[in-house]
Amino acid sequence: MTDKEDFIVQEAYQPTEEEKQAIKELEDKDQGLVAGDWNSQKTYIKSFKKNLRNDMYKKQNKLCAFCRIHVPSACVPMHREHIVYKNKHPQWTFLPENLCVACPSCNEYKGTTEVLVDPQTSTYPNVGDGFKIIHPLYDRYSDHIELLGGVLYRGKTDKGVFTIEKCHLHRVGLAEERADQKMYMENKGSIIAELILLTTISNHYVDDQDDFIRYVMDIVEGYKLKQVKDNV
């Protein structure tokens, strides 16, 4: 795992005064904040959401909070992610500490998952121990998840296992994306040898071992053909 992937966000997004006022107006309604307020068309609520995504995208090194894969913003924009599901805890809908960015897949798989250790708490936890899932502001990723060969996700703690399960980090496409990135950045021969070794344990770490093995074998065949052409 690289230092870039192993980030802890040092500071949540800091709303502008206008954004704070717009949020306060929603909080001061008779019924208080409700999850649907997230879709408010108020100018400064819209700017809050835009600015938050841009800010957290940079602070997260342009990586998803949960899988730590880069998603180019020009292709598929990162989703704004409520770490604690807003429908269950609407009082934290606009709390910057409860907001990060995540790739569309992790966001969808995590869905409505309850991530609080104490779901009845009325105070938002300010330490990682309050969450069952890795929190990008409070948890060091490598304390909870190991990347085997930089490709396969293995939980080191209950929190790591929970994050892998709920965000479906054992999806085979994620392993293949990580392998693709390594092939661009490192010595191809040594990486291929490592990938072949990973196929022997991949049944524990990907949801489709056959697909992963086929993927690696295709890489091997492509590498062999290139070697032959280079030697002609």
Where are these regions (language model features)?
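Short cysteine-rich loop/turn motifs with clustered Cys
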Residues: K50-P77, C103-C106
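Domain-level detector of nuclease and nuclease-like folds
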Residues: G111-I191
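Histidine-centered nuclease catalytic patch
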Residues: R68-V101, Y109-P125
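Extracellular structured ligand-interaction cores
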Residues: N61, P96-N98, R140-H144
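Long, charged N-terminal interaction/targeting segments
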Residues: M1-D28, V232
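C-terminal, charged low-complexity interaction regions
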Residues: V161-V232
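Short, charged surface segments at domain edges that flank catalytic/cofactor-binding sites
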Residues: K20-L63, K88-T93
